[in-house]
Amino acid sequence: MAKMKMIIDCDTGVDDALAITYILANPDIELLGVTTTFGNVDLDMAAVNSKLILELFHKGEIGVYKGASHSRVSDHYERHAKSNAIHGDNGIGNVDLGPMKGKIEEKNAVDFILESARQYKKDLHLVFVGPLTNLAECIEKDEAALKEVGDITIMGGALTTRGNASIYAEANIISDPLSAKIALGSSLDLHLVPLDATHKTLFRVSDIKEWKDINEAGKDLYEIARYYYVRELGGEETGGAMHDPLAAFASYDPSIITNWFACNLTAEESGRTISYFEELNLPRKRHHVALDVDTRRFTKEYIDLVTALIKNN
């Protein structure tokens, strides 16, 4: 059976790195490339961090492609203090993975995504786990090509729970609400994995303690994850939410989500993801939103796969 082809678009901080690691660990997925944007860190740091994670697991031949450096509602990038606190100065828990051995690709992220969409069509799954600026540009350039892919999954939004950037807003959406509005207002069928589901996937330091004793790669990944788990929600045994890994997992296996809610959403300037009255009764629902998750299965399968990747490194 052919492997599922996947591209992940990310702003590589800690949970992005853990999502890339999951894709590498899954033997049924072929990671075609990593595209990057601003968000947890700036564009250049996101690209370098992505390459360093690939190289950590001897997959440096996989290309990293840079996209948007700032949102559509600003002319520059400014890092939020919360991102620095949660992800560290370097975005990967202040762990030094050494100098990058390879190079970042010259091709733009949007061009790479669209070329891959045209080539692989239904065999390709696209996972967007940062601000949606690259996705919005893809839609404006060739929405028809995106309609042919097998799946588009977004980590973003908050429907039944408060946001993590404001009472309403989730960080990826508020980082570029105009691009989010373009994405949600398109004709594309989208899967959204919001905080409603990801905040039910809390990993604790004790869940991954085995990694640090396997080898150097395991120790590095453990330290990257530990930095985040201790800081995101307030303590070592509270844990950290696996936002981006859950989105990648759900794109591969949607059954991990136990409640998909069908609706039509938009993004407001405030970063709120909401449905307007005019959309409520439309027969076609473009968006399927994850509201609940099989946390036990997700935790076990994620840790088992990544532990095996570390052991085989």
Regions found by a protein language model. Give the residues of each.
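Short, surface-exposed amphipathic charged segments that create phosphate/polyanion-binding patches used
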Residues: 78-85, 166-170, 208, 282
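Metal-dependent C-N hydrolase catalytic cores
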Residues: 4, 47-51, 55-119, 285-294, ...
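Short N-terminal amphipathic alpha-helices
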Residues: 32, 61-66, 263-265
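Short secondary-structure transition/capping segments
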Residues: 44-45, 77, 203-207
